[in-house]
Amino acid sequence: MGQVLPVFAHCKEAPSTASSTPDSTEGGNDDSDFRELHTAREFSEDEEEETTSQDWGTPRELTFSYIAFDGVVGSGGRRDSVVRRPRPQGRSVSEPRDPPPQPSLGDSLESIPSLSQSPEPGRRGDPDTVPPAERPLEELRLRLDQLGWAVRSAGSGEDSATSSSTPLENEEPDGLEASEAGETNLELRLAQPLHLQFEGLTPQLSPSSGIPQAHTPSPQRSQDLNTGPDEPLPNGEGEHWRLLEQEPITAQCLNSTDQSEFTLEPLLLVADLLYWKDTRTSGAIFTGLMASLLCLLHFSIVSVAAHLALLGLCATISLRVYRKVLQAVHRGDGTNPFQAYLDMDLTLTREQTERLSQQIASHVVSTATQLRHFFLVEDLVDSLKLALLFYILTFVGAIFNGLTLVILGVVALFTVPLLYRQHQAQIDQYVGLVTSQLSHIKAKIRAKIPGTGTLAPAASVSGSKAKAE
């Protein structure tokens, strides 16, 4: 007893410091904090010092305090066994280990399973044993593995600050299963054909939100692969790039279609009317035109226009009043029967206005140019032909009225195209006979005129060339 008391007295006099006496509240459970410090390390002290100084650059005491602190924080935190570095073979679970540093690019590339040497020939990581035909696919696999490992390393940087540095025994099977599942997923994706992988580049609209969602893009084929420039592409990849090259041509065609759409629509509507595509519409328009023209034969144009406008207003007003009456007797909603036509947007965009103005201006300019060509005698022959035409019209005007000619023209427009479609072969045969007879008569006349006989064969040749063109 005499020897023990001075020892306790000495302990009482010496104050405890934070570095000599660890706090029980900071360390947590003693077994969980220090149970790994009693086992032997696999590496030597020199290697441990080099590794510690190289990775962390701090003394060993900081490493020990980090392990003690990590035991408390990581006990309740989430442990993700997939993003941790793989444990070296030959080290038991109870062995102490240094805290996992942040994985650098070199460590990530060395730890990729696909880059390690495989005992099986033709596997990944052995480019010499890979057949030349499979080298592009092998390089694509390696790049996808590197991208997946970089994502895992970025996720492990966030989880390593809160998770325990030493995995437990019951977590090891889950980590192995997760890593195997990830590898299987990656291999299944790589086993798909290349054209299916490139289809992931196109965005898809989600049915609920309508927001385009893009699949995970696969790396595009670059020039730094092992394939040469003359190596043929696979079928799926070649077709994909061919479609991509054709896209600008398609867009250019669509742009030209949009520009000519404004001018082609009226022509198509007129053609449908003249060819009687819709019998009811063509019949109604033909009847209305003929009735109006026949009325103009007996009445003035002012009275005909006023009567037609009054008839249209009577029809629309009566229909509107009828809907109001149905609303008053609670048998209708009273909406305007012409609301659909009132809601139609008749405004022209800036592009349509510019195109329309350009077309009108071009027609006006061409008409003025032709009139100047004929009446200012730019070409004597053309002016004489126009004079002959007006001379013939003087006799026609003495026999027929202008409205009569218009009526005959309307009848011809609604009958001749339909008849020509139904009897095209016979009409072409008779037209060919007539044109041949006319050309023969012209040749005889030119042969009798002095000075034009040598020009007749050249004119016939040029005419045949023009017909062929």
Swiss-Prot record:
Any Gene Ontology biological process: brain development
Tissue specificity of this protein: Expressed in brain and spinal cord (at protein level). In the embryonic brain cortex, expressed in neurons but not in astrocytes (at protein level).
TM annotation in the entry: 293-313, 388-408
Protein name: Reticulon-2
Localization terms from the record: Endoplasmic reticulum membrane; Sarcoplasmic reticulum membrane; Cell membrane; Cell membrane, Sarcolemma
Polar residues bias spans: 159-168, 203-226
Cysteines engaged in disulfide bonds, as pairs: none
PROSITE patterns, sorted: RETICULON
InterPro entries xrefs: Reticulon, RTN1-4
The entry's keywords: Cell membrane, Cytoplasm, Cytoskeleton, Endoplasmic reticulum, Membrane, Phosphoprotein, Sarcoplasmic reticulum, Transmembrane, Transmembrane helix
Compositional bias (Basic and acidic residues): 32-43, 135-144
Modified residue annotations for Phosphoserine: 44
Cellular component GO terms, alphabetical: cell surface; endoplasmic reticulum; endoplasmic reticulum membrane; intermediate filament; neuron projection; postsynaptic density; sarcoplasmic reticulum membrane; T-tubule
Domain Reticulon, chain residue ranges per copy: 270-469
Cell wall biogenesis/degradation keyword on record: no
Membrane topology type: Multi-pass membrane protein
Compositional bias segments (type: Low complexity): 14-25
Main location: endoplasmic reticulum
Region (Disordered): 1-180, 201-238
Subunit description: Interacts with SPAST. Interacts with BACE1. Interacts (via first transmembrane domain) with ARL6IP5/GTRAP3-18. Interacts (via N-terminus) with SLC1A1/EAAC1; the interaction promotes cell surface expression of SLC1A1.
Function of the protein: Inhibits amyloid precursor protein processing, probably by blocking BACE1 activity. Enhances trafficking of the glutamate transporter SLC1A1/EAAC1 from the endoplasmic reticulum to the cell surface. Plays a role in the translocation of SLC2A4/GLUT4 from intracellular membranes to the cell membrane which facilitates the uptake of glucose into the cell.
